[in-house]
């Protein structure tokens, strides 16, 4: 086993390096999760950080029973990358910032009627489609900064002369509704495989997965229409879900909470809004539960960010980054909570995965313009 895939007990592992900081509370939460009934193995990713009871940036394998609470309330949250036809050399920061600042958080009903796929036209949560949501969700125009593997880059249909669009969002209120109903009935005890309740949850879960994927498509479409661009999808990968899976000779359930699959083609590991993102080719590995980091991982909790930063920066100053990119976020609390300083370096996470033999880097992307939820604020 790689020196970077580290056993903490018979059932608990982390992907880590000596110079990669992981908060002790997150490790405690890994051990707590490993003690759940029927849990066989848990693996913390390099971006591991504490969550509300269960860690984020981890994968969990159980047999005979699965745990919706491990997946959490944003079922299907993930990353979608699009190759746009926006010429990098013609990109005008002022013009694009103005156009995207005029984009409402929620799509208009007339737009939904014209653009929604027929399968979602009558969905009870249809009004949320095309909306980014709060927290760490975002859409970001990016520029190819470095091509590391030219062959894989070309095979993916990527183009360094044009900008990319990255969308990070999930199932919006759908997943929250599913989890609330589940917890009200079953608390955190999980569901026995094959039971009526388990089958019902999986059906709702799969609907949320599909909803999240379409939501990312609709977000990308709204943004590209707003800036008069077109594009084509490169990848779409969820990092919050549960699925039937065989690990070794055991058939069971693989939960991913902030963990990117390594067995579904190219993935992107994003940094904070002031950091690079990395397109990588996974190298499948059963020991790590076929999972990788889903981002850089937080260093600071949300509640401490403004206290740490407000004396040094105004919200306006935080709308510009050290890489020269711009941030559209009228929610003054959120712009502090999601500051680049609150996150680890994406490169440290990526290098840990490289050293563990789990990925092949393909390209590095630099942020150009990041769009966040306005929190209902108007410019």
What residue spans do the PLM features occupy?
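Domain-length cofactor-binding catalytic modules of enzymes
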Residues: 2-29, 37-43, 50-56, 60, ...
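Glycine-rich loop/turn
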Residues: 34
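N-terminal glycine-rich flavin-associated loop
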Residues: 81-84
């Amino acid at each position: 086993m790689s020196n970077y895939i580290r056993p903490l007990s018979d059932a608990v592992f982390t992907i880590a390096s000596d110079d990669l900081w992981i908060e002790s509370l997150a490790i405690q939460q890994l051990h707590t999760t490993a003690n759940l009934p029927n849990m066989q193995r848990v693996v913390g990713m390099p971006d591991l950080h504490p969550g509300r009871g269960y860690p984020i940036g981890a994968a969990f394998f159980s047999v005979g029973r699965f745990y919706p609470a491990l997946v959490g309330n944003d079922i299907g949250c993930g990353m979608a990358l699009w190759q746009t036809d926006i010429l990098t050399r013609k990109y005008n920061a002022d013009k694009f910032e103005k156009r995207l600042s005029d984009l409402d958080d929620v799509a208009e009903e007339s737009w939904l009627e014209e653009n929604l796929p027929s399968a979602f036209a009558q969905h009870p949560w249809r009004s949320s489609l095309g909306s980014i949501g709060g927290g760490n969700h975002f859409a970001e125009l990016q520029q190819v900064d470095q091509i590391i593997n030219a062959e894989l880059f070309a095979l993916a249909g990527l183009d360094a002369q044009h900008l990319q669009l990255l969308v990070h969002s999930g199932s919006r209120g759908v997943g929250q509704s599913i989890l609330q109903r589940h917890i009200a009935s079953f608390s955190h005890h999980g569901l026995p495989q094959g039971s009526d309740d388990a089958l019902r949850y999986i059906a709702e879960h799969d609907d949320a997965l599909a909803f999240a994927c379409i939501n990312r498509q609709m977000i990308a479409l709204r943004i590209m229409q707003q800036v008069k661009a077109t594009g084509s999808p490169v990848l779409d990968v969820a990092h919050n879900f549960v699925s039937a899976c065989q690990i070794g000779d055991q058939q069971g359930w693989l939960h991913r909470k902030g963990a990117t699959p390594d067995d579904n083609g190219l993935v992107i590991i994003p940094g904070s809004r002031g950091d690079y993102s990395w397109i990588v080719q996974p190298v499948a590995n059963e020991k790590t539960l076929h999972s990788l980091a889903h981002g850089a991982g937080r260093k600071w909790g949300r509640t401490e960010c403004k206290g740490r930063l407000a004396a040094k920066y105004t919200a306006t100053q935080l709308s510009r980054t050290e890489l020269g990119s711009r941030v559209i976020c009228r929610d003054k609390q959120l712009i502090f909570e999601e500051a680049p300083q609150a996150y680890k370096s994406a490169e440290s996470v990526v290098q840990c995965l490289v050293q563990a033999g789990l990925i092949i880097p393909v390209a590095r992307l630099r942020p150009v313009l990041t769009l966040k939820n306005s929190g209902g604020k108007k410019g």
